[in-house]
């Protein structure tokens, strides 16, 4: 805190914006406008030499069209005109933006948007979406935003016999829209989930999640020995049982999970591969006469990598209760015992506690 150069200074930034729209909940269009600008003299001169003042205008459109009860389209689009350095010289030509924005040699105009189609037919829900963000798309209205990529996503869900719920998702993404990177990175995320209710007390949920990352040539051919080609797969199974009496409400759940993270490069040595197995057990009881919940949990995790193995066991006991007439004062407390071991390296046993209160 005593070092004046430990953290860069920041310009005083002024901004304004508005939103206007027309339509109903099913069919509408909204217009957004944001303008933000840094005040060049708001920081010390020593910092001005290192940090350029910036300016930004963003125009956005958001809309929805519902041609049928079972089909709806939504879209979001934005154009950002960004001056990366207000001190840069102006372009000596007349443009239609002169009255609202000084076009400089540091100015960038970039586009971002997405389009979604949603389908809902007799127990089947489906959607498809596409998103594109141009390289160097930047806005002073957001702290951080990924750019230089496009993606396509699909989702599908249905219910069978009013007892079984099925859902699946898939999305693919690739960067290097500018075609200027050395390599193009592609990522694919996919998942499938199923949930079945047996009677009025028992439920079973199973799921699979996967991620595949690969690399293609950009301005340079990919080297087979260093090519990125990784896959992560995760499987889970969760049976749960619950029932109530006049005095108590009981719920028990068991969770089993296995995750495999591996390098698919044929030249890989397996040093970065990790396989994790986890098992969890939870029991909750609601004591109705005193309106208090008690929870007992236990979890075991075992991760095995290249010449390494990690083991963790955690047991905890917690309680919570709401007070006052509106039940808006909440108190909770818990105590936990944790055992961690890195095989042939270290072992640790720790005890912890937690107490929290909230009012809403």
Could you tell me what each predicted segment is?
Residues 1-21, 30-52, 133, 137-147:
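Surface-exposed coil loops of outer-membrane beta-barrel proteins
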Residues 19-25, 118-122:
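Eukaryotic alpha-helical scaffold "rod" segments
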């Amino acid at each position: 805190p005593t070092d004046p150069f430990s953290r860069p200074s920041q310009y005083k930034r002024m901004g304004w914006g508005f939103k206007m729209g027309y339509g109903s909940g099913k069919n509408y269009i909204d217009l957004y406008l944001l303008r933000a600008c840094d005040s060049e003299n708001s920081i010390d001169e020593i910092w001005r030499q290192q940090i350029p003042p910036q300016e930004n205008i963003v125009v956005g459109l958001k809309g929805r069209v519902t041609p049928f009860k079972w089909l709806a389209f939504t879209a979001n689009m934005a154009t950002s005109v960004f001056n990366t350095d207000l001190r840069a010289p102006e372009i000596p030509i007349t443009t239609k933006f002169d009255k609202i924005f000084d076009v400089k040699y540091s100015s960038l105009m970039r586009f971002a948007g997405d389009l979604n189609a949603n389908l809902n037919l007799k127990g089947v829900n489906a959607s498809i979406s596409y998103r594109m963000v141009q390289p160097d798309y930047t806005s002073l209205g957001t702290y951080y935003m990924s750019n230089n990529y496009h993606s396509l996503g699909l989702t599908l869900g249905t219910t069978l016999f009013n007892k079984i719920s099925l859902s699946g998702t898939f999305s693919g993404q690739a960067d290097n829209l500018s075609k200027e990177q050395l390599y193009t990175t592609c990522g694919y995320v996919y998942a499938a989930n199923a949930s079945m209710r047996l009677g009025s007390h028992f439920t079973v949920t199973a799921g699979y999640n996967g991620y595949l990352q690969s690399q293609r040539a950009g301005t340079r051919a990919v080297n087979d020995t260093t090519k990125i080609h990784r896959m992560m797969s995760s499987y889970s199974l969760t049976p749960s049982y619950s029932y109530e009496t006049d005095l108590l409400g009981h719920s028990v759940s068991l969770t089993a999970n296995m995750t495999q993270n591996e390098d698919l490069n044929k030249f890989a040595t397996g040093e970065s591969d990790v396989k994790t197995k986890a098992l969890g057990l939870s029991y909750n009881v609601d004591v109705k006469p005193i309106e208090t919940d008690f929870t007992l949990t236990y979890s075991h995790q075992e991760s095995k990598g290249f010449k390494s193995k990690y083991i963790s066991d955690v047991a905890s006991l917690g309680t919570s209760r709401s007070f006052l007439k509106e039940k808006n004062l909440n108190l909770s407390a818990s105590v936990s015992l944790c055992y961690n071991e890195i095989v042939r390296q270290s072992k640790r046993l720790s005890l912890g506690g937690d107490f929290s209160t909230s009012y809403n």
